[in-house]
Amino acid sequence: RTLLALHQPGNPVILPTVWDAWSARLAVDAGFAALTVGSHPVADSVGKPDGEGMSFDDLLARVAQITAAVDVPISVDVESGYALSGDQIVDGLLGVGAVGLNIEDTVHSEGKRLRTSAEHAELVGALRRAADASGVHVVVNARTDLFLRQDGDESDRVDRAIARLTEAAGAGADVL
């Protein structure tokens, strides 16, 4: 619950992005109370492309090195979930000491299509149920990529993004 407690309305938490034990130690030494492992820098650091260019197991290996090096809560960008179940994602993250995750609605393994709102909420719900079943409050951050894409009409993009994130919150996301 430490990571969740850092998320306070009106007082946003700043999570610096780290990619290895060295960058994590630098961030903690600078005074940050929690960290996030970014998909792009961690993939770049091992010569792989962002967008699930490295496997989930490879990501977990890097996260394990980071959590072994620092004693602060770690959240991990799991991109679109590597086509895994909520249980597999949560079990993997908890197994290496992470207590938060970021899940996006672009499905990299399926031609970078955008999940429907219902699909994204279903995945968020599966992640929440898996976390709750573990007994650890994993902080679930749901993200939409609507503003990074040219999907749909520009005139209602903000409304569609709000609707997508509202549905994700209803499914159990802690952070949007």
Model-derived features with residue positions:
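Alpha/beta enzyme core
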Residues: 1-176
